[in-house]
Amino acid sequence: MSGCCFSFAATASTSSTSLLYLFTQKPKFSVDHLSLSTYNTHFNFKINSTKLKAHFPISSLYRSSIFLSTCASVSDGVEVVQEDDEEEVALSAEEEEEIEEKEERVESESVEGGRLYVGNLPFSMTSSQLSEIFAEAGTVANVEIVYDRVTDRSRGFAFVTMGSVEEAKEAIRLFDGSQVGGRTVKVNFPEVPRGGEREVMSAKIRSTYQGFVDSPHKLYVANLSWALTSQGLRDAFADQPGFMSAKVIYDRSSGRSRGFGFITFSSAEAMNSALDTMNEVELEGRPLRLNVAGQKAPVSSPPVVETSPENDSDNSELLSSLSS
């Protein structure tokens, strides 16, 4: 049957039982996004995705997805009708999200509240070493050191989840500003929380941007730690002459840092001084990448060919011989 992803024919002897048998076998494809309406002179019944899910494991339905186009109606055949595709896709995504949330809901609310950001760690620090250190403050539920996906090297920060909020506060008291492996670590609650707390992030972002003082003398800063706040960026540049303001740029939908920001100064001289002083300086385990905001890369000029007096005289003689 042309134009269809699959086809099958129902003969006069085909019964509804045999067709149901076909659909109750373990599928090699997903029909989660479709509603199948089957009509024939010998049978008249309807199968939709909700009923099919009673026969198929949900995990197998989500593992693969084959979208079936509408097949032409033929006599003694089966017509496949695609109904409310957008609603089916939205429903499917919603159901999948609910399943994932149920599977991931293994930690209590108190444990979630005990999640800490730990910055400026030694690059050689391991999860087990960090867990041993924080065990001084209480029960350590989880340790996640963040690694670069390309180099597989530690990015110098981690997230430590303590057994309770009280233990997390004790860890902040004990370790924030302390020396770990020769480095002064920073320990606090993450600026961007999980779950429903993200709803208040848009207001926080607006507040951060409103406090920013703009200036034509502005630096663009990249390669920022994901957990670095606008206040942290201001603190890093506060001692620079002519410093005015700084802000980290956040994604408005997720509330997460985009890894870059801007710093403003009162004059071009102050801006250039900070550029020379702070470029490549490490902040929370990552070297800053500074550039003048809006500055385009300089266009490379063609190489200058130097000629000696001897070459000039040789060229003159050659031109004279050619013209004569």
Swiss-Prot record:
Residues 1-71 form a transit peptide. GO terms for biological process: chloroplast rRNA processing; mRNA processing. Residues 294-324 are annotated as: Disordered. CDD domains: RRM1_PSRP2_like (cd21609), RRM2_NsCP33_like (cd21608). Pfam families: RRM_1. It is found in: Plastid, Chloroplast. Could be involved in splicing and/or processing of chloroplast RNA's. This is 33 kDa ribonucleoprotein, chloroplastic. It comes from Nicotiana sylvestris. The lineage of its organism: Eukaryota, Viridiplantae, Streptophyta, Embryophyta, Tracheophyta.
